Structures are given as structure tokens and as C-alpha cells.
């Protein structure tokens, strides 16, 4: 199979993975309107082509939180990553480390903090949810700090799980889910051998370490559903700061007022994100939300963005809309499921090449030169910058 883009990895992952795993990462909330808009809105962002700009010394290096990234990309936290490839978190972290970008370990990873951190040179980031069990949260923060994690990604857009209809149909949840997953695994022998058998244990490593007992997929569904905390408030950031003195990024911001509050409560960064369209269907795409948020807090706090990013051109678009760096989620998981560490490494190489092409043809020699000036502004006045659909004349 020829791999030239993230879409090729998606097609390959769909063949490789049991349906319950493919649709768990591929799907979104409710009717998946926001999931689609994340990609569609970003694809409508039009860039200004510039020529004769002498682009011989182009650089993608990006400073962030006292680190220097080789390009403005980090791997996002993805739950159950180790179910998509054998010890998947370790493989993905190795690919990110080799590329010179951060890897973010999810609270609900298969591989625990202590297994992943020693395998890479670059300090990884750690993601944490607000949960009813504050003992678990404190334990996770202390373990992340002891393992040398540099940055905390605090996910705040899950006070309750989103309703994901695909999961009930695919076997991740719903009637007879365990039996359906078993038969799906039998019908996908490559995954069953490589991950199902040789990727064990399939514990939720960070939770097992705290509870002192093995935790499987059913525990993941039950324990998390009962532990998300709807009482979450900005005051929780003050509690977090008692146990974490490093950079803290608030993930799940879609409104400028919330972005201002993040600044006011001492966050070091925000992630403009709708959780990949997996939480509340019908909210703004990240691309639509980003310009107003950047107008409100640019320069006061680091702005990261995710949701809908599938290639290097999308990275440039997000930065032009106001992001400093992006998080890559689904795209890297497709690559991981297809070819493990090598797949993620190849995807990151593709993204780097695509970014260089986009920057060369827009006349931006560095990441700092990508801005609103890189956008075509006259596509329409009624929608946020550069997000109005083109007319028939424009499309020509």
C-alpha cells in the first residue's frame, strides 16, 4: 500500500483494527456534526501565496515552555493508545522523541508513566482529568513529577462523558459488548496476535498503579464514568498548583472568556479544542473558535489547538489563525495502528514536508512569520477570518 498522507493511514487502520477500536477513535459525539466541521472548516482556510521571497533558510523550530520543538506539533493525549499497537504509548513516544517534539501521555493509557518515561530522552507531557477521586489525581501528579514529566495538560471539557452513538454500534459499549469485541478480535488476526496476545497486559496502567489491582476495558468504562466530576471549577486549578509547579496547559477552551479566565487563574497555556468532536456535538470547530480566542489572549498565554488537523498544511492554517503550536491526535493513532513507531515517524516526516511546502509558498521563513497576514481575508465578512465558503467565482 502506498502511504502519502494521514488519510492512507486511516484506511489501513480500518482494515487492521477490530471495529470497536477503529470506531472508538474515528467517531464523535451524537450525529458527529462537529467532528465533520473540524475538518471542513479548517480546509476552507485560504492562504496567501507569495513568490520570489528567497526561502532558502526556512526553519520550523518553535520555542514553548522552556523547550525548543523541531516543529510546532506535539502528540496529543489519547486514551487506550496501547490497544492500537503493542505497548503503543512507548512506540508513539519514541517516534515523537526522535522527531524532537513532545509526547503527551493520557491519564487512561495502557502503559503507565513509569514504563514510558525512561524510554525517551525528552521529558514527556502528562494529561490529567478532573476526577471525583482526588487521591488518584494527587497520586498521578506526584508520579508524573517523579518521572520527569515537564508539562501538565489539564483536560477540563469532560465533567461528564459525551454520548457517542458509534460506540454502541461498534461493540465498545452496548448489549453483549464483551462478546462482540471477542469475535471482532478473532476476525482481525494481525491485531489479535500483535496486540491482543503479545501486547499484554492490557491494564490501564496509571489507574492500576493507584488501585493496586489489574484494570481492563470494562473497568475503564465503569471507573471513568463514575469518576468524572461535574463540580469542576476554576478553583480546582489552585488545588492542582499545590502539587504541580511546572507549566500547566488547560485543554478544552472554545470561548474567549474562558481563555481570559485561564490567564487570570495562572495557566501557562490553553488548548483550543472541542475534544475532537467527541464531547458536545454542535459546538464550534476549533478553527472557527481560534481567531477570537487569539484576539483575546495572544501574548498573555501560550495558545495550542487541536481537532481536525490531518496534515502539515492544516498545521500552518491553525498557526495563521492564532495558534502557537498544535496537538495531533487521530492522525498519529491511525499511523500507530498501521505500522507502530515507524508509522508515526513517517507521518511526522510527511507533516514536516507539507509544512515546508506551505511555508515556502506563502513566504514564511519561520513559524513566527505565519500570522493573519498569511490568510486571504476577502473570502467573506459574515464568518470568522478566512472561514467563509468560497463563491463559484472564487472556486475557479
Curated annotation (Swiss-Prot):
Q: Which InterPro entries match?
A: Aldolase_TIM (IPR013785), Alpha-hydoxy_acid_DH_FMN (IPR012133), FMN-dep_DH (IPR000262), FMN_HAD (IPR037396), FMN_hydac_DH_AS (IPR008259), LldD (IPR020920)
Active-site residue numbers: 275 (proton acceptor)
Q: List the Gene3D superfamilies.
A: Aldolase class I (3.20.20.70)
Cite the GO molecular-function annotations of the record: FMN binding; L-lactate dehydrogenase activity
Pfam families named in the record: FMN_dh (PF01070)
Matches recorded under PROSITE patterns: FMN_HYDROXY_ACID_DH_1, FMN_HYDROXY_ACID_DH_2
Q: What is its main location?
A: membrane
Positions bound to FMN = 106, 127, 155, 251, 306-330
* Protein residues bound to substrate: 24, 129, 164, 278
Q: Enzyme group, top EC level?
A: oxidoreductase
Q: Which cofactors does this gene product need?
A: FMN
- Location(s) in or outside the cell: Cell inner membrane
Q: Please state the Enzyme Commission number of this protein.
A: 1.1.-.-
User: What are the recorded Gene Ontology BP terms?
Assistant: aerobic respiration; lactate metabolic process
The UniProt catalytic activity note for this protein reads: (S)-lactate + A = pyruvate + AH2
Q: How does it sit in the membrane?
A: Peripheral membrane protein
**Which GO CC annotations does the UniProt entry carry?**
plasma membrane
The FMN hydroxy acid dehydrogenase domain covers which part of the protein? Answer: 1-380
Keywords per UniProt: Cell inner membrane, Cell membrane, Flavoprotein, FMN, Membrane, Oxidoreductase
| Assigned protein family | Belongs to the FMN-dependent alpha-hydroxy acid dehydrogenase family.
Q: Which PANTHER family match?
A: L-LACTATE DEHYDROGENASE (PTHR10578:SF85), S -2-HYDROXY-ACID OXIDASE-RELATED (PTHR10578)
What does the function comment of this entry state? Answer: Catalyzes the conversion of L-lactate to pyruvate. Is coupled to the respiratory chain.
Q: Which HAMAP family match?
A: L_lact_dehydr
What is this protein identified as? L-lactate dehydrogenase
Amino acid at each position: 500500500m502506498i502511504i502519502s498522507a494521514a488519510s492512507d493511514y486511516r484506511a489501513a487502520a480500518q482494515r487492521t483494527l477490530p471495529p470497536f477500536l477503529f470506531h472508538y477513535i474515528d467517531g464523535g459525539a451524537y450525529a458527529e456534526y462537529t467532528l465533520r466541521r473540524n475538518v471542513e472548516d479548517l480546509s476552507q482556510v485560504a492562504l496567501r501565496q507569495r513568490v520570489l521571497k528567497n526561502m532558502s533558510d526556512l526553519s520550523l523550530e518553535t520555542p514553548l515552555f522552556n523547550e525548543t520543538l523541531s516543529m510546532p506539533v506535539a502528540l496529543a493525549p489519547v486514551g487506550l493508545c496501547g490497544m492500537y499497537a503493542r505497548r503503543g504509548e512507548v512506540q508513539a513516544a519514541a517516534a515523537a522523541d526522535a522527531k524532537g517534539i513532545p509526547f503527551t501521555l493520557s491519564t487512561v493509557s495502557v502503559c503507565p508513566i513509569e514504563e514510558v518515561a525512561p524510554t525517551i530522552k525528552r521529558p514527556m507531557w502528562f494529561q490529567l482529568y478532573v476526577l471525583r477521586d482526588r487521591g488518584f489525581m494527587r497520586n498521578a501528579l506526584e508520579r508524573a513529577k517523579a518521572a520527569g514529566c515537564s508539562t501538565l495538560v489539564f483536560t477540563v471539557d469532560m465533567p461528564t462523558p459525551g454520548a457517542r452513538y458509534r460506540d454502541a454500534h461498534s461493540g465498545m459499549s452496548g448489549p453483549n459488548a464483551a462478546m462482540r469485541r471477542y469475535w471482532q478480535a478473532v476476525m482481525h488476526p494481525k491485531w489479535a496476535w500483535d496486540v491482543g496476545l503479545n501486547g499484554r497486559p492490557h491494564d490501564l496502567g496509571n489507574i492500576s498503579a493507584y488501585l493496586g489491582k489489574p484494570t481492563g476495558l470494562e473497568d475503564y468504562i465503569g471507573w471513568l464514568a463514575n469518576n468524572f466530576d461535574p463540580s469542576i471549577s476554576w478553583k480546582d486549578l489552585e488545588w492542582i498548583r499545590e502539587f504541580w509547579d511546572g507549566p500547566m496547559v488547560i485543554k478544552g477552551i472554545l470561548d474567549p472568556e474562558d481563555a481570559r479566565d485561564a490567564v487570570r487563574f495562572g495557566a501557562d497555556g490553553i488548548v483550543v479544542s472541542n475534544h475532537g468532536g467527541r464531547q458536545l456535538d454542535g459546538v464550534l470547530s476549533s478553527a472557527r473558535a481560534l481567531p477570537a480566542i487569539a484576539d483575546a489572549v495572544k501574548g498573555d498565554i501560550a495558545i495550542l489547538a487541536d481537532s481536525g488537523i490531518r496534515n502539515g498544511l492544516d498545521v500552518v492554517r491553525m498557526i495563521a489563525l492564532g495558534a502557537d503550536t498544535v496537538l495531533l491526535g487521530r492522525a498519529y493513532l491511525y499511523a500507530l495502528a498501521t505500522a507502530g513507531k515507524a508509522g508515526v515517524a513517517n507521518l511526522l516526516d510527511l507533516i514536516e514536508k507539507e509544512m515546508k511546502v506551505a511555508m515556502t509558498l506563502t513566504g514564511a521563513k519561520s513559524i513566527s512569520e505565519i500570522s493573519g497576514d498569511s490568510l486571504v481575508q476577502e473570502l467573506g465578512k459574515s464568518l470568522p477570518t478566512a472561514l467563509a465558503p468560497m463563491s463559484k467565482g472564487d472556486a475557479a
